[in-house]
Amino acid sequence: MYYMLIGFIIVVIAIISAGYILKRKHYQRINELEETKIKLRERPVIDELSKVKKLKLTGQTEALFESWRSSWDEIETRLFPDLEEVLLEAEMNTDRYKFRSATYVENDIEQMLVVIEKQMDQILGGLKELLISEEKNAKESRMTKEKFAELRREVLTRGFKLGDTLPYVETKLDELAENLNRYDLLTDQGDHLEAREIVLIVQKEMKVIEAQMERIPSLLHETDTILPEEMNKLRAGYEEMVRKGYYLAQMELDKEITRMKTQIDKMKRNVINLDLDEAEQGIEELHNEIDLFYDTLEHEAEARHFVKENHSPTSDKLQRQNTVSDALAEQITEVKQTYHVAEDDLAVYLKTSAKLSEAKENFEQLTALIASGEIAYSAAQDTLKEIDAALISIGAEQDKFAEELRSLRKDELEARDDAERMRRAIVTLDRKMERERLPGLPEEYLSLREHMGESIDALEKRLEEKPLNMKAVTQDWRIAEEDLNHLTEKAEEMMENVRLVEHVIQYANRYRLRNKELADELVQAENHFYNDYQYKKALEIAVTALEKVETGAFKKVEKAYESKVSVDDIE
């Protein structure tokens, strides 16, 4: 019982302590919120409103001031009283140990303080800006009016440099003067915000006018002096070159100068209307056009030098190529008596001959135009270059064709010599096979041998035709070469098989008396070897039989054969 009482007392003390701690914590937060409220109340909103109210306000400024005052009245008459009530509610909840309710209320108080602070910031910021604006307007107004007076003086002293743009500039200045008068009126009426907008507009416009006054004299100098002088110099240079014999009608300079004068008039109107960017762009484009005309004249002078330097050499080159072409025609006539010349090959010559005639005709026309002065030197230069390129191409094609004609005789002699060589090669191959003392020759080889002879006969017969068709000769020649190579390969293979069969049977004889199956298969191999001369088949049968008795024996025999070691020495 005693211990229960002690435990109860401890629990009560713990509850009271916890309540005290929580209560103290909530009062601490409430006090902090109260301090924030006091700081907000101490902000000088009323003082700032009083300062601004002393100013003479109208228009936008007055409307803004009224909105700020209305916002402050709301804070003073509604938001602060509401805040007091909620603070009292938080204290009551804390006293009654309604800590959860107290927490909710404290959070609401924080939000209310944020709203009040935000509204007060807006009011004070606007009032401050208005006071500064009034002071700044006065300062900037003085500076703006001084700058405007300077512009007026500059127009009076340097107006002659503005030419026909002077009335337009003066009109702009008159508009600015009206805006400055309006600024004074708005300031007197107390509409300081709208007055500030006017000051900013005037400052911006003055910068534009100042920049325009800097650019106008140079642009007028371009349209009134520089460009006309440039065109006069261009015309003088053009006329001098015409007197020297240049054909320049393609430039249509009179028409172009008339057009450029119209462009200058348009650019001058742009300057007068203060469309300076468009005028500047047009002036730059016109300078570029004049430069292009000068480039054309310079190109004509360079082209004249080129024509004078290259006309005679091109004429000589044309004559030389005509001589080559005539010689080639004679060569074709001679060759056709002995050799057949394909129509395709003749077409190549005829095509180059036609190109040569065209080049000659173009050169003659060009020479006549140069003599009469009816062609621009640039066009004459282009034509000369085209003729020269054509002559280079024609020369290469005709040289190639001439070489092909010369090679016909060379190819004929080589084909005749090779036919003799192939006959000698067959005789040599026959003798080599005789020395091998073969039991006989298989039908397949005899057929190849006969076909080889026919191929050489066909080649020799083709070489006796008149006129000689070298394309057909070349085809028969290639066939004969292929047949000889094939025959030689078969002969070498056959002799190789014969030697290997002899070595394999000789090695297998050591097992012959002891192995009847081997003996029978060796007899079969020997029948193919001696009777029908199927040496490859005989080798296959003998090798298969030997491998049954001794695996790997053929490799030993083959190695001994390659090393020229006697079969009897193989272990």
Swiss-Prot record:
GO BP annotation list: division septum assembly; septin ring assembly
Transmembrane parts of this sequence: 4-22
Membrane topology classification: Single-pass membrane protein
InterPro entries: EzrA (IPR010379)
Cytoplasmic side: 23-571
Keyword Cell cycle: yes
Extracellular side: 1-3
Entry keywords, A to Z: Cell cycle, Cell division, Cell membrane, Coiled coil, Membrane, Septation, Transmembrane, Transmembrane helix
Function: Negative regulator of FtsZ ring formation; modulates the frequency and position of FtsZ ring formation. Inhibits FtsZ ring formation at polar sites. Interacts either with FtsZ or with one of its binding partners to promote depolymerization.
Family label: Belongs to the EzrA family.
Protein name, as recorded: Septation ring formation regulator EzrA
Originating organism: Listeria welshimeri serovar 6b (strain ATCC 35897 / DSM 20650 / CCUG 15529 / CIP 8149 / NCTC 11857 / SLCC 5334 / V8)
